[in-house]
Amino acid sequence: MIAVLGIKRNTPIEIREKLTIKANKHDEYLDRLLKYLDGVIILATCNRTEIYFNVSFINEELLKKIFEIFNWNYSYRKYIFISEDKKACKHLFEVTCGFHSKILGEDQILGQVKTSYFKSLNAKALNLELQRLFQYAITCGKKFKSQSRLFEIPVSSASIVVNESINKDCKKFMVLGYGDVGRLTMKYLLAHNINEVYLAVRNKKIKDEIVDERVNVIDFEEKNKYINDMDCVISCTSAPHIVIKKQDINNIGDNILIYDLAVPRDVDDEINDIDRAQVYNIDNISYINDGNKKMRFDKMDSNKFILENYLNEYYEWKRLRSIAPFIEELKVTSKEIYDKRITTFKNKCKYRGDVDLANKMIKSTSDYYMNRAIEIMKEETLKGSEEECLRIIKSIFIAKK
């Protein structure tokens, strides 16, 4: 069966950051999980940790193995949800369409689902059922995004913090990290009339990618030379530890906004004790009214039928897959009967031309009845009457051995 294991929706960030998955160990995790699961996809983003898998059954022993592989403390089990079969499938489709994002309808999740899918595909970590589920979900996500026209009002944590800081008259910025979120943050920042941006990175080659004169690319270790002169700092690294400590921020100076887009958090919570500093973590940011939330909800809600349609298509595929062995058996039987009949005719017929004509006639007749039987079998399967139909067709077409 298909199942998903993830972190419950309202789990505090203090717990979520202890249940993260290290990106640099993704392939290792897949390899270890496959010892216990038939197929697995790890969806790990800055604000989502979910494992989709195929398994015969789920028990506490299996859950403990999964916790052990990710080095999670099993005392956090109460913060984990597990959904199976149709509930798991529906959850994936809703995730892919943006219904479960902290920021409703945010535009990064579809790409993140695709990336996770291809990582498992390339690692040969998928069975057919899980592979087809994600193919349907990704196709659904594309259709949903296109038809609901969410691209007309794109939103992400990066766009929200940039707009919020611009509205608060910030002119001097520092961005920490240049992964997917960091790049997106820089894109939004540079679309505005700002004075300068300090981009703190560990990879010095990134400097060659930046052509905007407002950007100063600095070594990550140099960030504290400039951080106290900034109006706004946006941190989005993948570090497993704090990168902005309380002692890094001076007590005296102009007001400074600090947005922490990372999970685990980049920013020391105690910085909030400094009068001139305001720190917002990813949970705080999700509550900021970006002005378009109601519009996005209406667009998404009115197009939810797309999700239901693709889910039903997947369920149909799954039901029809259950009769695939019988269809194969029917084709083999049909060929055996055809071969016997044409061999008998050849032995009795004197003229080659008659054999060719008979060959075509017998083959077309055999194919017609076989294909018609398969069509009926599929129709009855989708109606839920496959067992009775299977019994009748078997008794007609497949002789007892």
UniProtKB/Swiss-Prot annotation:
List ligand-binding residues for NADP(+).
G177, Y178, G179, D180, V181, G182
Reaction(s) catalysed by this chain's protein: (S)-4-amino-5-oxopentanoate + tRNA(Glu) + NADP(+) = L-glutamyl-tRNA(Glu) + NADPH + H(+)
Q: Which GO terms describe its biological process?
A: protoporphyrinogen IX biosynthetic process from glutamate
Instruction: Report TM segments.
Output: none
Cytoplasm in keyword set: no
**Which residues are noted in the entry as substrate-binding?**
T45, C46, N47, R48, S101, E106, D107, Q108, Q112
Q: How does it assemble?
A: Homodimer.
Put simply, this protein is called: Glutamyl-tRNA reductase
Organism the protein comes from: Clostridium botulinum (strain Alaska E43 / Type E3)
